[in-house]
């Protein structure tokens, strides 16, 4: 049995890269017939890829599932079967032509709703961001005011400590001794003067 990896490689190479190269050649040569052919193929392949997303989940257990996928891609690409052109002309084009107006209306409504939803969620996001910024600013301002208040209280305490008067008390012991020393020469001088005056008399 073919594994998932081999099936995926075959689909990528022959279902995507090979048609992409020939689509490039059709655009380069401006061949309208080839251009239309590959446009029909890409529409069918887009539907196949969409369906494959779900069938890989729910039908991967089916016997020969991956072989059937490879065979389907080969059928789409074969110039003999022209599977993509057949599916497009028989099923896809008539269905899209009959439902085109409804599909366009649904797309317009989806576009408008998605735009409104985007604007709504954008406004809500801006409101939440603004509220968070205001709360952060208020908390930061409160913390800053508390910090400044604590600093001002410390400054007042320091100023009071520097301007306090010196404590009153008895003079230091050295002051009395120095005054005694200074007064002793004065007393001896006055005694000598009195002795001199008495001798003269």
UniProtKB/Swiss-Prot annotation:
The keyword Cell inner membrane does not apply. One of its GO terms (molecular function) is microtubule binding. It is found in: Membrane; Mitochondrion membrane; Endoplasmic reticulum. Residues 158-201 are annotated as: Disordered. GO terms for biological process: endoplasmic reticulum tubular network organization; regulation of intracellular transport. Its main location: membrane. GO terms for cellular component: endoplasmic reticulum; endoplasmic reticulum membrane; endoplasmic reticulum tubular network; membrane; mitochondrial membrane. The modification Phosphoserine is found at residue 152. Keywords: Endoplasmic reticulum, Membrane, Mitochondrion, Phosphoprotein, Transmembrane, Transmembrane helix. The chain crosses the membrane at residues 1-21, 35-55. InterPro entries: TB2_DP1_HVA22. It is a multi-pass membrane protein. Residues 188-201 have a biased composition (Low complexity). The keyword Secreted does not apply. Detected in olfactory sensory neurons of the olfactory epithelium, and in total brain. Belongs to the DP1 family. Interacts with OLFR992. Interacts with SPAST and ATL1. Interacts (via C-terminus) with microtubules. Interacts with ZFYVE27. Required for endoplasmic reticulum (ER) network formation, shaping and remodeling; it links ER tubules to the cytoskeleton. May also enhance the cell surface expression of odorant receptors. This is Receptor expression-enhancing protein 1. It comes from Mus musculus. The gene is Reep1.
